[in-house]
Amino acid sequence: AMLCTAGATVIAELSDAPMSSTSRRDTMTALEVYTRRLHYGCVSAAPSSGESTTDKSYYGLCLVTDDGETLSVSENGSGMAVSELDIFNLNDARMRSQTYADAPRMPIARYTWELHLAETRLTRRIKREPFVPDGHIAEFAERCLTIQATGLIKRMEYTNCWRPVIGVSGGVDSTLVMLACAKAMDICGLPRKNIVAVTMPCFGTTDRTKNNAITIAEQLGAELRVIPIGESVKKHFETIGHDFNDHSVVFENAQARERTMVLLDIANKVDGLDVGTKDLSEQADGWCTYNGDQISNYDINAGMTKTMVRAVVKYISETTEDKVLAGALHDIWDTPVTPELLPIGDEGELLQKSEDSVGPYILQDFFLYHMVMRGGSPAKVLRLAELAFKGEFDHDTLVHWLRSYCR
């Protein structure tokens, strides 16, 4: 800690821990905990087998650990672990942390030497979905739902409004909100009929999404209301003098605002709360209608990125005992992300897909994490993306969507 508070971002450690049945795992765990708490990189090396004596054995365990993540470990006593430490990320994490705010600065000896900078090939693994853990997905999904449910419960307590009102579209975002609201009702010991699920088909609604929305509401035991808004929107177009065949932003936003008005009015009518469905990815990108889906009484998806939402919905689809619910959840997970604000095709097919406009959400969330959460420059993020998505997206595609994201 003294070295870190003095400014050290990388600590080279000579370890004297002998080999045991648990020493490898114990050393990895300890370094992950320490480096995460103090935000530093550690290069650790233990004695090789040549140092083994009568009562102690060594096998040259070497590790490279970066801010809580083990990047490289020597295997079978090879005594070699190679990886890269991200100094920029470490400094950025320290600026965001309270650990160093009031930490005392201790006097230390300082030595200087010359370093030659050179760009090398990156060897460390870069996660494609940085917001979603590699393992323990069950714990991750349950924690996400619990956090959403407990936040909603507290808001309902403050307002004394115990009826969540949700616009259900048949997409992953509103589906996750339905699941979280059902969990909130279960925790409170309230009937799930307190949930008012409202589906509002209009010009861009497909049978697939409408049927999935109805199935989710019915299987979760919510009160279902099907309210077509097409005629109301057409009347609004007449009022403002907008041509129905002009599929501009007016055409799209009028539908989104009509849905929001219906939800807020129903919430007033049942003494409830309009629970929003927009997620963090959409908010960060501005992919929502101002005074439409951009507003609600309480938004429990605000801290969930699109990849997180999809991961939780997929997990529930694979673990629920309700086969009908599981089928609908899987189909929702498999449905292209869409606001359904433009008319469908002649054969009822979906024509408007969000990812055609804003880019693949797996890239959106990757950019969000490395630029906003980690403070990376566009050039750095592009280099990381080329490594993470090698073979999936070419250079020109990554540049195109990164420019779009930074615009």
PLM region descriptions:
Residues 1-8, 31-32, 150-156, 281-282:
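Structured alpha-helical segments in the cores of large, soluble enzyme domains
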Residues 2-81:
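CN hydrolase (nitrilase-like) catalytic-core segments centered on the catalytic cysteine
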Residues 39-40, 51-52, 66, 84, ...:
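ATP/NTP-dependent adenylation/nucleotidyl-transfer catalytic domains that generate, transfer
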